[in-house]
Amino acid sequence: MSTMDCSTNTNARKINVIYVRFLSKERRSVKLLNYRFTRDMTQSREVLAMMDTHTTTFGRKRGCTVSPCGAFLFGAAFLVSLVVTGLLVYHLAPCLEDKLVKSCNNFGNSVFEGRGLFNKDTYGKKKLDVRLPSSVVPDSYELGLIPFIQVGNFTFHGEVRILVNVTEDARNVTLHAADMHIDESFTNIREYSNASVKADRIIKITEQRNDTERQFYVIRTSDTLKSGRQYMVHLKFVGHLNDNLQGFYRSSYTVGSQTRWIAASQFQPTDARRAFPCFDEPALKATFKISIARPKNMTSISNMRRIGEPMPVPGLPTYVWDHYERSVPMSTYLVAFIVSDFEMLKSEFGHFRVWARSDAIEQARYTLDIGPRILEYYEDYFKIKFPLPKMDTVALPDFSAGAMENWGLITCRETAMLYQEGVSTSSNQQRVATVISHELAHQWFGNLVTPSWWSDLWLNEGFASYMEYIGVNAVEPTWKVLEQFVVHDLHNVFGLDALESSHQISIEVEHPDEISEIFDRISYEKAASIIRMMDHFLTNEVFKQGLTNYLNGKAYKSAEQNDLWDALTKQAHNDKVLDPKITVKQIMDTWTLQTGFPVITVIRDYNTGSVTLTQERFMLRNGTTVTTSSVEPLWWVPVTYTTESQLDFNATQPSQWMKAEKSITLSNLNWVPSEWVIFNIQETGYYRVNYDRKNWQLIIKQLNKESFRNISTINRAQLIDDALNLARAGRLDYAIALDVTSYLAHETEYLPWKAAFTAMHYLDSMLIKMPSYDKFRVYVLKLLDNVYKQVGFKDSPRDPQLTVFTRIDVLTWACNFGHEDCVQNAVRQFYNWRNTPSPDKNNPISPNLKMVVYCTAIRFGGQIEWDFAWQRYLETNVGSEKDLLLHALGCTRETWLLSRYLDWMITENSGIRKQDAGRVLNSIASNPIGQPLAFNFLRNKWDRLRKYFGTSLLIMNNIVKSATRGINTKYDLKDLLEFTNEHIGEFGSATRSMQQSIEQAEANIRWVEANRVTIQDWLKRNTA
């Protein structure tokens, strides 16, 4: 799934079923259907929760009266109590915060206890054993679904036959089911026999029970289900097409004034159980034969090809059945089906198809162009043919994640699949390419070979996140995406992984909330980074052949990381790349089973020519390495380096290993004392590098020469990122780190500037409320002066991709800091657009300049500019344009507009889709004026947010992250801790995000105390 994603129930007696969305307390339409409920379901907590509060009535009750004198005495007593309460609060309140902070007298020096708020034992539900019994496992499914896609009846009826294998004697069949009613009068189990002469024996059922906490449906039998035999389990059920973007859900779009509805599925990680009863664990693969009933004027698609002609649905004259071929063995989370009125385009040979709204289908042509080529490239790369007969990709109006790799049926949000030339930006185009490449890589990593359990999610997402760059590079080589990996993925995840609240790549998870939590940058970007590291230290040929062996050996099965290690080790030993005594498991377990990453400190002996390398976990807590672990983590570190004389920035195979050793010394290196040395060539290793002061000074001297390009572009980016983050963590003097950045006045390449902007964004967010901020602004503008002149405010279609990206970032920072020419250009271009006849059809702003122009004009404008942009958002048919406008609307400095925007974000039919709420809040929280508004909104509207989005969605994760970032005062931290303490246990899949936000806020406060004066003094000296 590309990222880095409530429930319903029913209640009735005998023949009536009333559908109500029970997690929302807003009144919903109800629909009576002919069906019967089980007694178990009518008494469940979910049913009690959906009682309609609007039916409560009030009447006059018996009471008492109070005399005027009594009322006076009562009032006097009340006033006295207020005074006493006020005195108590005055004297006692300051130390009430002891619950949150150990010391209320010395807050700035206190030991923060935010980490203590989060304990696994806090969540009773997470203690539950939510794994299915292993005694009964699925072999095959036959699934039929009839979705009713109409206002007032968003339901679906279903029937499933599951052929199960019994691996040990059992007296029950336990499977998953959630948010649906199962008709227990219809349920039956038969012993299955292939012999046509022998009738299948019926197994007597003694009890059927919904275990709602575990999301289990348990069928108990009087007879023992015998090991080694097969049984057919037959179930009928009714569910609700929800609007929470999970399970089998509904989505809509408008054509003119008409709203059109579709039904789509999103099952990863644990939501197939919301669409049909199933064994919803990734290792429990089975084949699926799917039938979908649909209105005659709509189309259905699923994982496999449709077979035969549509068949009538008895009793539903406007519906027909579509039957699909039986699938290959696959996990439940990869099952998919869609019913829509979309249009389709197909490739030359017809096996690759793209689907979208009829007025957006032409925007899918870029996907249709690159998709088949990337698929073919992967077939050659892995030496394994794509195993399905077709591939569909579908652009959905509402989708929680970026995209989903369903086998043979990739689903995407529109911005991840659609590209409109002349409207969409180069960045949009690259996003489409990387998302499609990512999801196609999953067809092998995740689909063909699936992790045995979600603990090894990284085997899916890490490989897809790395392979996406390789796939895009094959079809768009001029973009240099392999170089971009360092600044887009590696540097991006370093910040998260430097927190104590980070987690191992391979981590034990059980509860669905825990599973959802790890769909994060660790499972995606860190995993991709260590895979890239393997690719380099094993060599590309060994790496590729090892992957092919792994995929062939585990095809249509599930795997654990040890299976991958074994395949790579065998190939590495065969090709003599690794010492026979060393295994990939020895090396890589230190990266997947330990949290964090090391900083390698390089101390040179300039007299002897030797160098000592020391490793220590890198953390952002001002140089401390205190962790919850009693054992200091050590890694197998591949060591690469070059010197000023050698200038070899291509040799990425390690010349030396740190074999989980605290330190090593390299001797007889023949280094010239007056020359610099740089470690971690092309930053292929997942670690930071610090140097002794003299080597840093030698590097700075080189960077300030005309020959600064002697250091490779990637390593220039590395030096900037390492220096500023080492200083942030208290491991390097900020004067040295900022001296490293001074050469940027002559830099024009994208990678170093991107690294600088990423690292300086933190400085910007910390300094913005301080007196020294103006000096920081002046310094950055001085650095930008040359590159601003180089890239200019004019976009050219002939510019290389990295030049375009450099221009976008440079103009964004220049305009943000009030660069006069930049602001004037942006405001003028926006003004011209406003005065253009038919602005929805004629936008004179170059696509790649839109983000800068929109945001700057709205920031320096008022309601007129905001309302104009909002109207353009409502009118545009291009998803990427909507995305740009949503972000730009958060740039305003008008507080009331931001407050209204926040409210619209959680208002039905406001025009903002649920999937885009994170985008809105992120934009507002990125605005210095909007950040406190965003956090207050999170605090004050928490219950409303939970009702609107639910706690298990990726959306809530994004909202929590955005609203709580940038906190750097003890008072704001106190508010954050109070909010967290008040709602502990309610964060669901956002629990880890909240924990990380608290830790980051604590680190920010320490940073301000430790570095404010040093940075202020340096800026004074360098901006005079």
Regions found by a protein language model. Give the residues of each.
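Surface-exposed beta-strand/loop patches in extracellular or lumenal glycoproteins
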Residues: 165-181, 289-295, 621-640
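A surface-exposed beta-strand-loop module
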Residues: 181-254, 316, 664-671
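Glycine/proline-rich low-complexity spacer/linker segments in large multi-domain proteins
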Residues: 128-134, 227, 234-289, 340-348, ...
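N-terminal, polar/Ser/Thr-rich
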Residues: 2-5, 15-22, 26-159, 257-262, ...
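Long, ordered, helix-rich scaffold segments
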Residues: 490-491, 527, 612, 629, ...
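Hydrophobic alpha-helical and helix-loop surface patches within well-folded domains
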Residues: 22, 262, 324, 351-626, ...
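Hydrophobic helix-coil surface modules that form long, contiguous segments used
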Residues: 158, 265-270, 277-437, 466, ...
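Beta-strand-rich binding/interaction modules
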Residues: 183-190, 301, 581-585, 595-680
